[in-house]
Amino acid sequence: MMLEHVLVLSAYLFSFVLYGLITSRNMVRALMCLELILNAVNLNFVTFSDFFDSRQLKGAIFSIFVIAIAAAEAAIGLAIVSSIYRNRKSTRINQSNLLNK
């Protein structure tokens, strides 16, 4: 695959998921959009690593670290969303103002 095709795919994925993150009203959907943004970035890391220096795996290794951090972020995010749902009975972002009780 050519470099331009993968970069266009990654930019397409990043831009539409960023739009989904901005317009999302549900916390779970926003968390999923954030994870997909990280996947678009990982696609760029692997593509540039393969295109410019295919003998070294720096982009792939960095991508694995980003995936591990994203997994931890998803676990913590889902725990926070679960706690907010138990207390507020809603996962809507505009109804989860924790400063006023």
Curated annotation (Swiss-Prot):
One of its GO terms (biological process) is photosynthesis, light reaction. It catalyses: a plastoquinone + NADH + (n+1) H(+)(in) = a plastoquinol + NAD(+) + n H(+)(out); a plastoquinone + NADPH + (n+1) H(+)(in) = a plastoquinol + NADP(+) + n H(+)(out). It is a multi-pass membrane protein. GO terms for cellular component: chloroplast thylakoid membrane; NADH dehydrogenase complex. It is found in: Plastid, Chloroplast thylakoid membrane. The keyword Plastid applies. The chain crosses the membrane at residues 2-22, 32-52, 61-81. InterPro entries: NADH_UbQ_OxRdtase_chain4L/K, NUOK/Mnh_C1-like. GO terms for molecular function: oxidoreductase activity, acting on NAD(P)H, quinone or similar compound as acceptor; quinone binding. Its EC number is 7.1.1.-. It is an enzyme of class 7 (translocase). It holds the Pfam family Oxidored_q2. Keywords: Chloroplast, Membrane, NAD, NADP, Plastid, Plastoquinone, Quinone, Thylakoid, Translocase, Transmembrane, Transmembrane helix, Transport. NDH shuttles electrons from NAD(P)H:plastoquinone, via FMN and iron-sulfur (Fe-S) centers, to quinones in the photosynthetic chain and possibly in a chloroplast respiratory chain. The immediate electron acceptor for the enzyme in this species is believed to be plastoquinone. Couples the redox reaction to proton translocation, and thus conserves the redox energy in a proton gradient. Belongs to the complex I subunit 4L family. NDH is composed of at least 16 different subunits, 5 of which are encoded in the nucleus. This is NAD(P)H-quinone oxidoreductase subunit 4L, chloroplastic. The gene is ndhE.
